Structures are given as structure tokens and as C-alpha cells.
Amino acid sequence: MDPCDCAKTGTCNCGTSCTCANCSCTKCKKSCCECCPSGCSKCASGCACKDKTCDTNCCQ
């Protein structure tokens, strides 16, 4: 189960790993909501996410 579940409240905060608003990841160190593109299990540390995806170069 994804601890960062925006579906229920529209916002979430996974400690220091992720902060989301309206199901868009505003910062991401680990997989959060729909921040990472398909096939990307987590974003690299410090990766900046835009809208609901991060650049594939951020993937680990």
C-alpha cells in the first residue's frame, strides 16, 4: 500500500520523502503518488517533479 495516498484527501506528506498537493508531487525522493513515470519505481534524491511526473533522468 502506498503510504502517500492522495486519492482520499487530495494532499499528503510522507515525512521528508514526499509532499503532494492535488495529487501532484511537489518534491520527491521516493515513489509518491503518480510522480514517477511508468516503470520508474522511485525518483533520484533531490529530483524535482512537475505535475504528476518527473523526468526519466531522475529515475533510479
Curated annotation (Swiss-Prot):
A divalent metal cation 1 binds at C4, C6, C20, C23. A divalent metal cation 7 binds at C49, C54, C58, C59. Residues 1-28 are annotated as: Beta. The keyword Metal-binding applies. A divalent metal cation 5 binds at C33, C35, C36, C49. A divalent metal cation 6 binds at C36, C40, C43, C59. Transmembrane segments: none annotated. Belongs to the metallothionein superfamily. Type 1 family. Class I metallothioneins contain 2 metal-binding domains: four divalent ions are chelated within cluster A of the alpha domain and are coordinated via cysteinyl thiolate bridges to 11 cysteine ligands. Cluster B, the corresponding region within the beta domain, can ligate three divalent ions to 9 cysteines. This is Metallothionein. It comes from Gadus morhua (Atlantic cod). The lineage of its organism: Eukaryota, Metazoa, Chordata, Craniata, Vertebrata.
